[in-house]
Amino acid sequence: RPVLAILEKFRSSVHGMVHVTGGGFYENVPRMFPEANKKRELEGKAPLISVFKKGSWEIPAIFTELENRGAAKDRMFNTFNMGIGFMLAVKADKAEEIVKAFADFAANDNGRCSTMKASVIGKVVAASGKAETQEEQVLFED
């Protein structure tokens, strides 16, 4: 419901959506841009990639525990959603307004979305090269 409400109000500002399931960030996030990247390839332009800001969202304690028990954090992003169940790629100049709209929806939905949080966690940019592998299509920066 919250995503539908956002689409009703901001459809022209939403460029991609993805449900982050098994396969984590690396397998799911690149699926947001297949048509845009096909077009960019035909135009001789570099593909779009996603760059996420480390520490921009709270990673649930279960993943910290897995890391403490020896799981490699970078590989966990290839398996788990790391607390991000759904992502929207939106116009940068509308991002904060959309985050606020999600918060307003959650606050006024009789508690059904009380645990839902929205935040800006990264950006979409043109790759500096071909970006053929998943690791080249999804980057993390400090």
What are these regions (language model features)?
Residues 1-142:
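Glycine-/charge-enriched secondary-structure boundary and capping motifs
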